[in-house]
Design a protein with these regions (language model features):
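Rhodanese-like catalytic fold shared by cysteine-dependent sulfurtransferases
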Residues: 3-9, 16-64, 71-198
Length: 198
């Protein structure tokens, strides 16, 4: 938590973009720089990490990673450590991760700490938010929108997916658009990355 306030730190969200779309750690002004790899899945992480612009942002910095429960951080930090040993173009001040992931962070900081929005979960709960934070505040923090009407909305309900055959990640559909998304619009739903041609 303390490292997030340090300017020589870079924090990387190693989750998929559809997860970061509804919530993420937001370091304080003057603190750590936030990097989002904008991945559809974790198989895209090595390519992002090997990009020259990414290496430049990590060089000489403390690198903190986080994910939902800590497992993806373990893999991501091992990959970065391996890269450091193999080449001189990405030498950091150290690699760290949020132990126990966002789940534990939100239990440690029930008011949210530096967390904004919701934590996407892969179980029946669907999402998790800071226990002591008002629902209206959480809604304003997310910044995500319905993929149909673009109205602010932050819940993945109904298990809708991007219609792009190479993508198929979950998309957000608000209550008012759900019926159309299940019917006539089903083959036109796009995630934010596909909308931006990323």
């Amino acid at each position: 938590h303390k490292m997030l306030g340090e300017s020589d730190t870079v924090v990387i969200d190693v989750r998929n973009f559809y997860e970061t779309n509804i919530g993420r750690i937001e370091p304080p002004k003057g603190g750590a720089a936030f990097l989002d790899p904008k991945m559809r899945n974790s198989r895209e992480f090595p390519k992002w990490l090997n990009a020259p612009e990414t290496k430049e942002k990590l060089k000489g910095k403390k690198v903190m990673m986080y994910c939902t429960g800590g497992i993806r951080c373990e893999r991501a930090s091992a990959l970065l450590s391996q890269m450091e040993r193999a080449a001189d173009d990405v030498q950091t001040q150290g690699i760290y991760h949020v132990r126990g992931g966002i789940d534990r962070y939100l239990k440690t900081f029930p008011g949210g700490g530096y967390w904004k929005g919701r934590n996407y979960l892969f179980d029946l709960r669907g999402e998790q938010q800071a226990e002591d934070k008002d629902e209206r505040v959480v809604e304003k923090e997310t910044g995500s929108v319905c993929c149909v009407c673009k109205f602010p909305f932050a819940l993945y309900k109904g298990k809708h997916a991007c219609s792009d055959k190479a993508c198929k990640v979950p998309v957000i559909v608000c209550d008012g658009c759900r019926r159309r998304a299940d019917g006539e619009l089903k083959n036109t739903l796009k995630c934010p990355l596909c909308e931006q041609n990323i």
